[in-house]
Amino acid sequence: SALAKLTLTVSISSTNRPTLITLPRNTQFTTSIDSVSYTFQTREVYSATPDANGLYTFKTSDGSSEIPVYEGTEKTKTFFVGETSDAQIYVVPDITMDTTTIRVRVFDTAVSSTFDTYTNINTASRITSNSTHYQIKEVPNGYYEIIFGDGTSTGKAPSARNKIIIDSLS
């Protein structure tokens, strides 16, 4: 997916300004070049607080005012973890998946609203048995397999009856 970086500011002149405003995940921005439209979207939530003049500048979690937006269509794949004695294989059937935009969430149950977010193991600086990381591997048909930890040396493994939701842009 193509990546653009935006600096987003909002000016609110009211005396009853909010202390915080948020830019939701999947907020879309459209541009056009040579009469061709391109739609980009955020992949996470960003927030902004006002300065003394009521100007809000959205920032990333590391404080940068450059907000990344990605071109593409979000696709979601849901898996349910079987008995842990069974081999667990999670293949996302999408040959156009942008692996840099993957978000992996593991829910306790099929109806649970709380989840752990798993991150790519390549971003880990330290791995313990409780680390929530995944690995990604392209399989021969061009799809991608998501591989979780083993519960010891490569991090936490999802448990039986967990629900796994993987979304990414394509």
What are these regions, as identified by a protein language model?
Residues 1-170:
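Signature of Asx- and small-polar-rich beta-strand/turn repeats characteristic
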